[in-house]
Swiss-Prot record:
Protein name: Large ribosomal subunit protein uL18
Assembly, per entry: Part of the 50S ribosomal subunit; part of the 5S rRNA/L5/L18/L25 subcomplex. Contacts the 5S and 23S rRNAs.
Biological-process GO terms, alphabetical: translation
Protein family membership: Belongs to the universal ribosomal protein uL18 family.
Length: 123
């Protein structure tokens, strides 16, 4: 009987396959997304130097103040996207390469991307 690969292993394979093809630079960094069951994280990475330029997540106190008590997971993800776009703008970054890290472009990942685009980040 064949062993069935888990969804996490499949996502990890997709992530590695995509990371071979896309890289971020100082002018056009990689917008990386990580999604857990409870939180969502986004960071801008310059792969040439191996440096994280800025990051945003649901753990930040500024985001908790902005949202108050509600919003749901998708609303919170959109707010994280808006926050990462604002931080990128303050660094003078207009364009990014979107790295969804093997996740489907749906739900929270899509909401984060739309939030970043709404604040003027291009990808």
């Amino acid at each position: 009987m064949l062993n069935k690969t888990s969804r996490k292993e499949q996502r990890e394979r997709r992530r590695i396959r995509v990371r071979k093809k896309i890289t971020g630079t100082r002018e056009c960094p990689r917008l990386n997304v990580f999604r857990s069951a409870r939180h969502i994280y986004a960071q801008l990475v310059d792969d040439e130097r191996g440096v994280t330029l800025c990051a945003a997540s649901t753990l930040l106190p500024e985001l908790k103040e902005r949202l108050g008590d509600g919003g749901g997971k998708i609303g919170v993800a959109r707010a994280v996207g808006e926050m990462i776009a604002e931080k990128a703008k303050s660094l003078g970054i207009e364009r990014v390469v979107f790295d969804r890290a093997g996740y489907l472009y749906h739900g929270r990942v899509k909401a984060l991307a739309e939030g970043a685009r709404a604040k003027g980040l291009e990808f």
